């Protein structure tokens, strides 16, 4: 075989810019190879040493996450995390981002984001059972943001609906910081019932490497490097870096792979996602402690004139790399072909710890696996010791700086007009970040597979029956899995540490609100450039907050994704970073889905109760009220006492399991008034609320935000049993937790009284009109 490794006919400086590599990187590559890299090899290093693939800026921070626990079977490092959910079932889950591709091709960017995360799930041997998403867009007063929203939602619904996996929930927020750089994070869940988890390490020398799925084209070339750089006015030129997906091939790939995995004849599996064939082959070899040899002439190609560089860096979708038992090879190939998929042997596992690539009888790349995958460079950043001055000034803000409330009216700093408290409630309900997302949910098939317990928006978390796929496990299993994705980006902007603690706490709280016990998280860290002092400080502080909350709540991190350089440049080179957005994907288990509760009231005259912590703060600093009504993003987010947070959630779950509670809803964006409004809207019933707060501003009572607060309802016939339950738990929780009755479910109006003074009296149909039509009315 002819060696073409010494073909250096390229401009080094220009090529380094294309690959997002530095001069220091180039020198290190030369040192590791013992020679200069050729152009193909440089491209391979470019994608493998990108932030997207090797976490070169964030790896030291991620190392501090708690990753082990009683239920964790597979933690970070594999395609997805795996936890034990009992009954011989395992839950596989992960979250990923497709931010940059969605910014320039919203439909395909979002669609392939769904396809990619689904492959991460079934690559582990699990059947995908659900998808959730966390989305961020600029405000809807700009037509470009509306176009992005429409495109992304269409892409998600198209791919998920066609592949037959329900989209069961999520969150969406709007802010101008995302106008040039939307966020598209997709979380997927899968159910695994086989004894063995399929991993990615190629551990048997001489075994064939099987390419399965779609053909390889030029779409997505350099996608990993593109995802690791900032967006600018020239980013539309990167449309070829966006992949094009085919959900019908994905569906065939799911079924064919799951059938193949059941045979036990597949030794290892890896999705060809970010960095394509380069990443899948290098990681497969490195994870197995061996090497791999690939012949590009055997790769099914969509086009005839593809170079080695294009083959290796293509991110064409619906492709898998498998290591299989040689004696079962032909049977497996026929099995894949039955599903209309390509199935070609393109190489083998070798003992020499190198990735060796050949094309047209020439070696076009030969790189030690450790150089590509294991010993990737780490960028060392100094973390500033004190929070930035501008934040410290914001933290000194006090609600006393707001206008005085007179006759239940207050002046808005935003438009200098007087509004009643009732008008403010309606105003907040029309905020697209708070308002109903039904226009979006209606485009998703949330019921396919028939395991969805609550429709999107009905409960604080998605809930699915863990209905066994395997006949051996069909033993009257009534258990279910709950999932939620959460992040209050405004809080993280104002205090990355507290804001990230709050994101973990809220995601756990949402899971608890349906009656499920939080078990583990996956996270998607969406941040701006780590090369600025503030950018890296935000990332570092957020990771510290996530770690602290996960330890306290006993919800280990099983994996996730880091998406940096989320910022946009305008024509004048002015940089607009996104709000730091560490999205938390929480999963939990409920023993009996029949006991789960949703958010809306159930019966007229049911009692309404509030549980909370005296030690967890609530304030209007950093609140939706302060932002949307007054136009102020200031103050310090309230501190959450994590011990009390855990107590409140445990109390609630226990009460739900004993059938005391009829409905449950956490208090988050918009505060108590908005939480009550949402319960009324979902049930088409009113609420009569009597509060006894003293010495507090009325807007604080209605709109303050914080942790550890949940409203719930119960049938008045259960009051005696419930009070006995409260008394028993008070001995365990002490005097730091309060549980108090605040009202009852009524027929048609939401009425809130404080010290016998009526603050608002609104018809439920008024509330619903504002809440349900806000997003659709923006178009």
From Swiss-Prot:
- Report the subcellular localization: Cytoplasm
The Gene Ontology terms for molecular function here are: ATP binding; magnesium ion binding; phosphoribosylformylglycinamidine synthase activity
Question: Cross-referenced InterPro entries, in alphabetical order?
Answer: PRibForGlyAmidine_synth_PurL, PurL_linker, PurM-like_C_dom, PurM-like_C_sf, PurM-like_N, PurM-like_N_sf
The UniProt function text for this chain reads: Part of the phosphoribosylformylglycinamidine synthase complex involved in the purines biosynthetic pathway. Catalyzes the ATP-dependent conversion of formylglycinamide ribonucleotide (FGAR) and glutamine to yield formylglycinamidine ribonucleotide (FGAM) and glutamate. The FGAM synthase complex is composed of three subunits. PurQ produces an ammonia molecule by converting glutamine to glutamate. PurL transfers the ammonia molecule to FGAR to form FGAM in an ATP-dependent manner.
Q: Where is the active site?
A: 52, 98
Q: Where does substrate bind?
A: 97-100, 119, 243, 315-317, 563
Binding positions for Mg(2+) 2 per the UniProt entry: 120, 271
Q: What is this protein called?
A: Phosphoribosylformylglycinamidine synthase subunit PurL
Tell me which EC number(s) this protein carries: 6.3.5.3
> Pfam families attached here?
AIRS, AIRS_C, FGAR-AT_linker
């Amino acid at each position: 075989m002819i060696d073409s490794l010494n073909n250096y006919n390229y401009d080094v400086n220009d090529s380094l810019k294309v690959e997002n590599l530095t001069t220091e990187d180039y020198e290190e590559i030369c040192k590791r190879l013992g020679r200069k890299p050729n152009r193909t090899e440089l491209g391979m290093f470019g994608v493998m040493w990108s932030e997207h693939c090797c976490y070169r800026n964030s790896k030291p921070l991620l190392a501090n996450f708690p990753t082990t626990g009683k239920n964790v079977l597979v933690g970070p490092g594999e395609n997805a995390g795996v936890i034990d959910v009992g009954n011989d079932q395992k839950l596989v889950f992960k979250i990923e981002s497709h931010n940059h591709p969605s910014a320039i091709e919203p439909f395909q960017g979002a669609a392939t984001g769904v396809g990619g995360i689904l492959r991460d799930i079934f690559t582990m041997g699990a059947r995908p059972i659900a998808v959730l998403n966390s989305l961020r867009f600029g405000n809807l007063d700009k037509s470009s943001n509306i176009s992005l929203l429409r495109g992304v939602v269409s892409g998600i619904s198209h791919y998920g609906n066609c592949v037959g996996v329900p989209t069961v929930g999520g969150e969406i927020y709007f802010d101008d910081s995302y106008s040039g750089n939307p966020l598209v994070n997709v979380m997927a869940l899968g159910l695994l019932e086989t004894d063995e988890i399929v991993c990615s390490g190629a551990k048997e020398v001489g075994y064939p490497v099987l390419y399965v799925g779609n053909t390889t084209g030029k779409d997505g070339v350099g996608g990993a490097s593109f995802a690791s750089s900032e967006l600018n006015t020239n980013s539309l030129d990167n449309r070829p870096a966006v992949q094009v997906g085919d959900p019908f091939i994905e569906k065939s790939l799911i079924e064919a792979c799951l059938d193949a995995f059941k045979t036990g004849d597949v030794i290892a599996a890896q999705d060809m996602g970010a960095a394509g064939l380069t990443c899948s082959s290098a990681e497969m070899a490195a994870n197995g402690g061996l090497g791999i040899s690939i012949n590009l002439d055997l790769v099914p190609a969509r086009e005839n004139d593809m170079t080695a560089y294009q083959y290796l860096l293509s991110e064409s979708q619906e492709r898998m790399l498998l290591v299989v038992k040689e004696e079962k090879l032909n049977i497996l190939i026929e099995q894949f072909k039955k599903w209309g998929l390509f199935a070609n042997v393109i190489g083998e596992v070798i003992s020499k710890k190198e990735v060796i690539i050949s094309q047209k009888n020439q070696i076009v790349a030969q790189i030690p696996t450790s150089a590509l995958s294991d010993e990737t460079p780490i960028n060392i950043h100094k973390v500033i010791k004190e929070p930035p001055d501008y934040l410290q000034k914001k933290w000194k803000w006090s609600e006393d700086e707001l206008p005085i409330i007179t006759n239940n009216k207050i002046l808005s700093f935003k438009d200098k007009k007087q509004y009643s408290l009732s008008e403010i409630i309606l105003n907040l309900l029309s905020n697209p970040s708070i308002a109903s997302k039904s226009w979006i949910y209606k485009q998703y098939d949330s019921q396919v597979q028939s395991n969805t317990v609550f429709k999107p928006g009905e409960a604080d978390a998605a809930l699915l029956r863990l209905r066994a796929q395997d006949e051996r496990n069909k033993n009257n299993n009534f258990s279910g899995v709950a999932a939620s994705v959460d992040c209050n980006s405004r809080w993280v902007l104002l205090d990355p540490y507290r804001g990230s603690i709050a994101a973990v706490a809220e995601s756990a709280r949402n899971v608890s609100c349906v009656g499920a016990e939080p078990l583990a998280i996956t996270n998607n860290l969406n941040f701006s450039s780590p090369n600025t002092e503030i950018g890296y400080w935000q990332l570092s502080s957020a990771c510290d907050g996530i770690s602290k909350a996960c330890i306290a709540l006993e919800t280990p991190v099983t994996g996730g994704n880091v998406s940096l350089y989320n910022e946009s440049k305008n024509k004048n080179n002015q940089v607009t970073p996104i709000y730091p957005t560490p999205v938390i994907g929480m999963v939990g288990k409920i023993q009996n889905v029949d006991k789960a509760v949703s958010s809306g009231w159930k019966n007229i005259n049911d009692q309404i109760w509030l549980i909370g912590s005296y030690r967890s703060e609530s304030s209007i600093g950093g609140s939706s009220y302060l932002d949307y009504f007054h136009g102020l993003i200031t103050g310090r987010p309230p501190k959450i006492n994590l011990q009390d947070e855990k107590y409140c959630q445990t109390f609630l779950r226990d009460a739900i399991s004993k059938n005391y509670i009829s409905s449950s809803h956490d208090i988050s964006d918009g505060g108590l008034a908005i939480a009550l409004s949402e319960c009324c809207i979902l049930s088409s019933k009113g609420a009569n609320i009597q509060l006894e707060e003293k010495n507090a501003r009325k807007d604080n009572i209605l709109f303050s935000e914080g942790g550890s607060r949940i409203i719930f309802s119960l049938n008045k016939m259960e009051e005696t049993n419930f009070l006995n339950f409260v008394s028993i738990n008070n001995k365990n929780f002490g005097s730091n937790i309060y549980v108090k009755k605040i009202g009852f479910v009524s027929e048609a109006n939401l009425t809130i009284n404080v010290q016998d003074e009526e603050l608002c009296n609104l018809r439920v149909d008024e509330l619903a009109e504002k809440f349900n039509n806000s997003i659709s009315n923006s178009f």
